[in-house]
Amino acid sequence: MTEHDTLVLIPARMAASRLPGKPLLDIAGLPMIAQVLRRAREARLGRVAVATDSAEIAAAVAAEGGEAVMTSADHPSGSDRIFEALEKLDGEGRIKTVINVQGDLPTIAPADIRAVLQPFAEPTVDIATLAAQIRVAAEHDNPNVVKVVGSPLSQDTLRALYFTRCTAPFGEGPRYHHIGLYAYRRTALARFVALPPSSLERREKLEQLRALEAGMRIDVRIVDSVPLGVDTPDDLEAARRILAKQA
């Protein structure tokens, strides 16, 4: 993998029920989408673009000197949105690896974006993602904290066996909080978006289960902490405090 065959895509849309218009909300003097764009560029992995159905978001990206690609408003998931963007930006197939950075992670460490590629040293891995060890007791039983159950491959890598909102695995030992940042081999992304929603995906409301049920391999890199996702006004204020200190 090189910066010439890797594409970082940031899906972003305006329709957020708890925080309307959140990609354009100000954080430390910039729209949130511009902050995410900066973090992705700081990872220095190659071309970075925002995939959006909003002209307002595209304009904010352009104002930051970034690249935006317009996509359909009808996509059921961010994975479908980034696949459309990939096909529009690289119809020739030069890009081999795609990283999906959520558009509501303005404080994510660029090192964590780079870390998601490390499982691809193993050629049979289809999809790579991140997790961090749960250290707050209340998170073990919180259904909004998605846990990854996996077989350890090394001190900092798991092979994912399941993702769940339940408290899992049972018994003594660490549990891991899944972080929704993904890297896909291009062939794996094309296969994934062509699959219908799976039974466990619908039950847990976790689209990565579609890949596991189809026999695709997902490996998980363990990082130090979970980045702040901005979903509520309290999250927004926390992100503002974090980035104000870094300014």
From Swiss-Prot:
Reactions this protein catalyses: 3-deoxy-alpha-D-manno-oct-2-ulosonate + CTP = CMP-3-deoxy-beta-D-manno-octulosonate + diphosphate
Localization per Swiss-Prot or TrEMBL: Cytoplasm
GO molecular function: 3-deoxy-manno-octulosonate cytidylyltransferase activity
SUPFAM superfamilies assigned: Nucleotide-diphospho-sugar transferases
Gene Ontology process terms (BP): CMP-keto-3-deoxy-D-manno-octulosonic acid biosynthetic process; lipopolysaccharide biosynthetic process
Any one GO CC term of the record: cytosol
CDD domains tied to this protein: CMP-KDO-Synthetase
Domain of life: Bacteria
Pathway annotation: Nucleotide-sugar biosynthesis; CMP-3-deoxy-D-manno-octulosonate biosynthesis; CMP-3-deoxy-D-manno-octulosonate from 3-deoxy-D-manno-octulosonate and CTP: step 1/1; Bacterial outer membrane biogenesis; lipopolysaccharide biosynthesis
Keyword list, A-Z: Cytoplasm, Lipopolysaccharide biosynthesis, Nucleotidyltransferase, Transferase
InterPro entries: Cytidylyl_trans, KdsB, Nucleotide-diphossugar_trans
Enzyme Commission number, as recorded: 2.7.7.38
Pfam families: CTP_transf_3
Family according to the record: Belongs to the KdsB family.
Function comment: Activates KDO (a required 8-carbon sugar) for incorporation into bacterial lipopolysaccharide in Gram-negative bacteria.
Annotated protein name in UniProt: 3-deoxy-manno-octulosonate cytidylyltransferase
Natural source organism: Afipia carboxidovorans (strain ATCC 49405 / DSM 1227 / KCTC 32145 / OM5)
